[in-house]
UniProtKB/Swiss-Prot annotation:
Belongs to the conotoxin A superfamily. This is Alpha-conotoxin PeIVB. GO terms for molecular function: acetylcholine receptor inhibitor activity; ion channel regulator activity; toxin activity. Contains 3 disulfide bonds. They are not added, since framework IV presents two different connectivities (I-V, II-III, IV-VI and I-III, II-V, IV-VI). The cysteine framework is IV (CC-C-C-C-C). Alpha-conotoxins act on postsynaptic membranes, they bind to the nicotinic acetylcholine receptors (nAChR) and thus inhibit them. This toxin selectively binds to the fetal (alpha-1/beta-1/gamma/delta subunits) mammalian muscle nicotinic acetylcholine receptors (nAChR). It blocks the elicited currents completely and dissociates very slowly from the fetal muscle receptor. One of its GO terms (cellular component) is host cell postsynaptic membrane.
């Protein structure tokens, strides 16, 4: 994620705030 297209990745994973 974080700019890399991935359906299995959630935005919160990038920020570390899930």
């Amino acid at each position: 994620c974080c700019g890399i297209p991935n359906a299995a990745c959630h935005p919160c994973v990038c920020t570390g705030k899930c």
